[in-house]
Amino acid sequence: MTAEDRFKLFGVYLSRPVYEALDDYVYEEAGVVDLDEYFDETASSVPTGDPGAEATDELVSDLVAEFAALYDEADFEAATAVDPDGFVLTHLAAKPTRVAALRERFEAATTIRETDLRTAHTAILAAFLSADPLER
């Protein structure tokens, strides 16, 4: 299999409410029952055609395309207020070029906002999923 036949796995840190919204999103898009258990964390890639990987690849594509608007909409203050132990690591799959593009955007957001990746991941995905970063 060539690189074009596989999606790259990468991790994002999310607050519990944003993770749950993402889990619901992937369930609705691809029927994935438990995103936390879906991808093998020890694997570096997933073959194309996998329904969960196809759904998260599309999500990453949308995040890259809409990043500027999501950045403007994101509630970084709420994401900053998340307890440091309140983040969940989850894995997504996407085309390697999309992974690289999204990582660059997240890195830029952390530099501009002078924050960490957990906060940027949570704020941007919360904006995309219309989720509240904090449990209230």
Predicted regions located by residue number:
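Acidic, polar-rich N-terminal leader regions of halophilic archaeal proteins
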Residues: 1-136
